Amino acid sequence: MGTAEMQGRLWGPGARDWSELNEPSCVPFYEAVFDAIAVRPGTALLDAGCGGGFALQLAAKRGAAVTGLDACGPLLDIARERVPDADLRQGDLESLPFAEHMFDAVTAFNSIQFASDLLAVMGELRRVARPGAPVAILIWGAPERCKSRVILAAIGGLLPPPPPGAEGPFALSAPGKLEELAEKAGLVPERADEVPTPLIYPDLDTAVRTQLSSGPARMAIEYAGEPATRKALAAAFADSRQPDGSYRQDNVFRYLIARA
């Protein structure tokens, strides 16, 4: 099973919860990136790994002509509900189904690190961007600045050891690593910045439900069962409880803007 096929299978069962409970929390970094690359009326934008289309919806409200690609059919169905006029394709980040130089801007929000061939993905993002167009890649910031690392660790603790070279969600978070990859793919790094993005849940049930909808959690469920996965997530959230009963995890995300 290829990477795209596997990711599509894992993210499908929780697509509705992920798109409705998690994606709205990402507005701070969606908007920061769209501001940085000047998304405006008429911008031909590709979001690679678009999920349920929340970012595409925001870009469309700015007047952009939006295109999205994702491996997960159920997430794309939700994206179609949100952005009926978008051009949405199911496919693989490592082999984008688009001609060369199609887009004025390309974004990838926390998606490329799930691919098996990172260099191939970056090369594809460059290929479909018009010469000189911005390619914006957003990833987790340094693990020590991301409280949600405890959630990722809890899920990882239920899984068998990853294959050699599989570095997980923080695969590109080390200083300079994303820039180095971009340069190898023929992109020209222009600027990088960080966006604080807290994840806030009204109660523990919502917090656990949100994380259970992710692809990595689905993999943990397949290996360890849902009760064990729920228990591990609840324990990981324990020290994020706020006085009002809500749960908050402060995180920093980092984005790079490079030119094709």
State each model region's role:
Residues 1-43, 54-58, 74-78, 82, ...:
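Conserved class I S-adenosyl-L-methionine
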